[in-house]
């Protein structure tokens, strides 16, 4: 499951560590309540009340998106993102030489509404760098008036990311991790759920900027900032390189099931 959190950085100093200790205590109480409820359901369906727990816990993310976890169990293993492309279609990019901005509105019900519409209000040479091209990757949505410098539709995001100079997205883990694996910087417009937590991790890692609330002016400023400075792409490239630190999920599962383990 993606991380649902406060968006806070790990605490520093005595006050920060105290804050984290208190928050962990509250979280532990919720976990204990969940375990109690699960034991009750297991008994109702004829399973042993005591859950033996998993052999391994696969953490499917980039190390660069993670935070220190002193309480992780020994069976937790970071295996890298596990992506799925829902289509084989390739979305055409408008012709030109300017930067390619891929916009991927959130598919979650808690995502920020209107991202595609606001993105299309930006104009190359006015609120975007001259020659900019906008590609809005979405599964469905209301009909939009699409200017000649933009494209809207369903297409493979991994293919779009090969050409992208910047990604604007809602902050869901799937698009964030795809974007960072491609070494592309981003502007994140988070909604609720895990998006606020992940957006703040991206900002702290250095590969993107955060917009909240969403307005044309705010989006224009942050897009311009990321495109004008190489430090965001450099941070995104560092995040992509962190994939070298993960374990092979197939090997992890095979080793866990090996006789005698």
Identify the residue ranges that each predicted region occupies:
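C-terminal amphipathic helix plus adjacent low-complexity
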Residues: 51, 218-261
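Short, acidic/turn-prone active-site loops that include or flank metal/cofactor-
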Residues: 1, 82-84, 156, 191-194, ...
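Nucleotide-sugar-dependent glycosyltransferase catalytic domains
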Residues: 1-100, 105-114, 128-131, 144
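A donor-sugar binding/catalytic signature common to diverse glycosyltransferases
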Residues: 153-201
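A conserved nucleotide-sugar
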Residues: 123-138
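Nucleotide-activated donor-binding/catalytic signature segment of Leloir-type glycosyltransferases, i.e.
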Residues: 136-156
